[in-house]
Structure formats: C-alpha cells, structure tokens
C-alpha cells in the first residue's frame, strides 16, 4: 500500500511521544505495522524492546501476521499482545500468579447463574441479565460506575447483592477476573521496583492500537511503563470512543499532549473505506460533538456511495424492506457477506432474525443471539397457546403448561391438584367443587381456552392480554419486581407482530422449533462465510461491509435511553449524548457502498419520532 504524507510522517517517527488520530478507514493498522518494521529495519531497534498493544486477541494475531508478511526474519522478539495479556505476563513474572488464578468467562457466567438460582431472582432474559451484571461489575472495578450509582442501574435491587456475592465467590477460590488483573498489576508496578525497572528496560518502544478505548487505570500503567523515555506511539480516534461503560473516556486521548510533553500530533484524515456521500454525512454528524479534536475526514475511495433514509410504517415493514432489499441486491451480484444489519441493542434484532430464518437467508450474529421465544412473557403466552391447542384437540392439557400460567392472573389453583403429566380439566373442576370462587375460576379458564383455540395466533395474543387479563398480571409482576411494564408488554406485542404471518397454532409451533434449531447452529457454527452479519453498533466496531442497514433510527433508541417517553424528544446530558453520537458515527462509517437508515413510524402501534441525529445529517 502506498502511504500518504501523514502516514509516512507517522511511520518514520523514531523517538518521543506521538499521538496519531486515525479516522475510520484511514489505514491505522498499516501505519502501526509499517512503523514497527521501520524501527527495526531502518533505525536498528532491537525487536525485544518493542511492545505492540491491541485490545483483542484477534487484533494482536492479525497485527502479527501483517507484520510477518513484511519480514519473517525481523519478526522474532517483538511482543504483540492485548493489555490483559501484558498484565498477566507481568504478574506471572513478579508474583506467584498463574493461569489457574484467572477466572474463565464460562465460570463467570456460571457464578452469576448460581446467584440467580440461590436467591431465586425474578428476571426476564437470563443471558442478557448475566451479561449486564458482568458489565456493571466491571464498571465498578474500572471506575466507570461508582458504588453509590448502583441504584440507578437496571435491576438495581439486585446490583449490590450480585457484586458482593460475585466478589465473595472470587475470594473463596483465590480467583481474579480481568479487571482485578489490571488493578493487581498496577499495584505491583508501584510497589515493586524490580518489576517496573525490568518492564521499562525491556519495552523501550510502546505502540498502542485503539488508544481511545483505554480506561484511566490502563493509561496509568502505560505511563508508568513508558517513563522516562516516553516512546509511546498512540493510535486512535476520539470520535470512536464508545466504551464509557468500561471506563473509556475521550478526555484521556484529548489530554495526551498535556501528559506527554513534546508530543507530535498527526491526523490520518483520509477514509479509504467509505464512498464520498457516506463520509460527508458522517462528518456532518460528528461535528456536532464538542469534546473532540477538530478534524474533517475526506474520502480516498472511488466508490459511488449511496446513503438513504428509509421511512417505513412499523417493524414488520422495516423487516420486509430489508429482506426484499437483500434479495434484490444479491440478484445483482452482491453476496450475503456484503451485508450487515446494525442495531443499537441486541434485543431489537430478534424479530428481524426470525424473518431471516423464515426467508432462508444465512446470517451470523456478532453476539450470542437471544431467542425471542424464551423470554418470560413469551413462555407464558406460548403456554397459553399450547393449552388452548391441546384442549381444543382432546380436552386435556399438559401439566407443565398449566402450572406455568394457572395463576397468571391469580386463580388460586394449587399445584398439588395437578399430579398427572396430562390433566383432564373436567376432573380439575371436580377437585375444586367445594371452593366456589376457585371452581368459577377453573370454569372461566376452560371457557377461555375453548374460545382461544378457535382464534388465529395474532388475535389469540390480544385475547390472552385483555380478556384472560394477562396484562393485569404483567402490571403487578412489573411493580413487584421493579421492572418496566412497558418493556414486558412490548414483548407480547412483538410476538403478536411475528405471529401475524401465521394462520394456525401448528404453524407457529413448527416455526419456533425451526427457529430454535437454526439459532443454536448460529451460536456454534461460524464456518459459513457467506452470511449476512447481524450486530449491535458496539460489536460492529472495526468491521466494514459494502451494504449497511441501521435499523430503528428513532428517538429513544438512537440516541438510546432506557426511560422512553411518548411526549416529545427525550432529554440527554451532554456527555451521554456525545457518546451516543459517536456510536451512531461508528455504525455509519462501517459502510463502503450503501448505507440505509430505516425509520419506523410506529413501534407496537405507538407513534415514534425520527432520531434527532437524522436532522444533523441534512
């Protein structure tokens, strides 16, 4: 690759601190690799004295492979590693720390799962809850969340409990997680002169990729290691700082020149990835942020890009538009792998994934795709549908389904009355004949199931919510468990939209079986390279696709707020709004040729306002 002037300046840099502000698609990896090669081949630096830090194992592996493609014989001795790997090496060398002391990710999940079971915590989606729990534990340790702020976190009534139980679990087994690794490493370097002397003597040239993603503690460790030579070559983009929940903060990058005297500043401001229109619009957006280096990115791509705001009626029409567009564009020569569908949250992708499966479009998910049919509300509604279907067929029902919803809403039916795996509801009436009010409730349930069995799937959900009064149960459940009723209710409405495509309960059950099987395959099989990528904004960072769909570009979602409002625009504090704008900027700049921003007019029949960020693109 031929280097431009700014890239050359960065690559030729030898000593002293340098901050490279690298915009999207500006060739930052090439610059890091070429500069590493130059240090050895041109300036004679000992490879053993070079440390290249990345944020993921995949990035470290890629960086090393890119370097070795330039020079096999000059590659030996360079340390390519993640920050966590670096911390582990230091602790292993200067303390009794071993790999056995580090908790595995699977064990972290198991730990939180056991806490849920131990305290019988009432939660909706267990996988999402565990991920969020581990995030706020990390947030406390990295300083992104203060302990006193726990009350403001979703599932706040469990936050302190989970944190304390998790820490007790680690302590009892003499284990550390990755955040502990960082803290222990910092303390070691401060207290053990031999360790810091060794590291400074070995790592005389430090190159840091994705510098905008580091937290304060990681920054302190880098400064400790770099002193007094301060040969730090930091590469990042303040406009792509999107991990505040991990403690990342653009101010770290903005203060680099203050912390490292005589810093040279270079801006890589040519985007070789995206076409001109996409670059122009993303520039317009990000310039509304104030906490940033002032820069304007230009395009170095010959791609004739298209960027388009697509207004749709609702989520169903949004899904239909995306499916039809993918089918049409693949006929014109694009592969499935040329497409990405990006969402602000993982939950938003559930109904879209069901449509991809229904249309036999291969896809891969950057996250562990959650199954929309395994949520608390979905399981209740499916139990009602199963009861109605079985009762309509032979007047009997399965015990497991009846137990799940027999008191949703409250009917005072007791579990001990249901001993057989298959329940005859006529027999159940006889068992409660002496309890008039319960007898009436059972008769009412039988009548409801009988009528429910005659309905199509979508109207059946309306009947469950309003006539059977499951809606009232959700109101009480949300109140008792400090959850959002609106979010629970919307899960039911989302099921209704999915079921609207089916004429019978049999079709629904068959589709759910197929959906669950294919979802399980997606979790374990990433061998199919020709597949549409479904991802959140965060997980798409660093990737690129010829065609990108950004869904649900509506207020309250982009920018995102847990506290949705139906009256006017949601208000954000400046810091949160700027991070959300950076996140939208990152998602837009994943696109090479075509960018589609879809805007539903309604979500579950509720009127929605287009994202305020769309106004900033005009």
Model-flagged regions — what are they?
Residues 1-15, 217:
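N-terminal pre-P-loop "Q-motif" helix
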Residues 15-16, 37-189, 193-194, 201, ...:
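A basic/glycine-biased coupling hinge at the interface between accessory DNA-binding modules
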Residues 20, 24-32, 261-264, 269-362, ...:
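Helicase P-loop NTPase motor core
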Residues 26, 208, 212-284, 295-300, ...:
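Conserved helicase motor core of SF1/SF2 NTP-dependent helicases
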Residues 79-87, 207-210, 235, 345, ...:
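Conserved helicase core region in the C-terminal RecA-like lobe
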Residues 259, 303-305, 334-457:
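ATPase/helicase motor core of nucleic-acid motors
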Residues 393-398, 431-539, 543, 560, ...:
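Accessory C-terminal helicase-associated subdomains
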Residues 601-618:
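Helicase C-terminal subdomain and adjacent C-terminal extension
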